[in-house]
Structure formats: structure tokens, C-alpha cells
Amino acid sequence: MEPNKSRLIVYIEDDTEMIDLVTLILNRRGYLVKGAHGGRQGLDLVQKEPPDLILLDLMMPDLDGWDLYQQLKANDTTKDIPVIIITAKAQAIDRVLGLHIAKVEDYISKPFRPQELIESIEKVLTSKKNSEPL
């Protein structure tokens, strides 16, 4: 559990129960999780305290997840932070758009198994660590 202690993950989601659930799952694995209720709050949080990873919902009332993603990638402070989409948009075309057009690091459809989330996060963070310059 120790290696994850310093890993900050921001989860941007408009459903408080989902934030609580994901926080519980990831805290048990040693990750530090900060939840942001909605896109605008998430954008502010990520710019003030850039995390190691962003978990992002797509369907939020205040700021659409794709709009937020574009803003993150256009900002020098946040453009290199990996993003995993967690959404109820489960159509194959949505997944293709996310992974191959937008180039998000991973795309998880709700509902998901806790192990699926953990494996995705570990894969993305390991890939990021391996691609960082020495």
C-alpha cells in the first residue's frame, strides 16, 4: 500500500455518491483522492494542485466532461496529466471517440468492478512513470 501514498488522484464527477465510492475504493489501496463536484470545481482544483491522475465523468451539468478535457489539454500546467474517463456512456462509439480520437489514457463504463478501476489506474500510472525522463 505504501507506494501509492504520495499519488494524488482527482475525481471530477457530479454524483457525490460516486465520488465517495471511488474514494473509498482507492483510499483502501493507499491513494490520496480529492473529489470535485462538477467540471468547474474540478478545473479549479486541478489547476491549483495538479494531481498524478484525473478521473473524469463526461456528463455533468455545469461543464461537460469533453469540454473540460479540452481545457485541461490546452493548459501547459495540466496538459500532461493522464485522464481516465469514467462514464455511463457505454456505447462502443463513445469508447472509440475517447480512446482513439481524444486520446484519453483509458475509458471505463459505469457500472464497473472495483478491480477494473484499480487495474486501469495502476496501468496508467505505471505507463506515466516509465515515460518520464530520468
Locations of the language-model features?
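Helix N-cap/capping motif at the beta->alpha junctions
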Residues: G35-D44, G65
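Charged docking surfaces used in two-component/phosphorelay signaling
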Residues: D20-R28
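Conserved acidic carboxylate
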Residues: E13
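Active-site beta3 strand of CheY-like receiver
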Residues: E49-L55
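Non-catalytic signal-transmission and effector/linker regions of two-component phosphorelay proteins
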Residues: M1-V10, Q115-L134
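Alpha4 helix (beta4-alpha4-beta5 surface) of REC/receiver domains from two-component response regulators
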Residues: D67, A90-Y107, E119-E122
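Receiver (REC) domain active-site loop signature in two-component systems and cognate sites
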Residues: M60
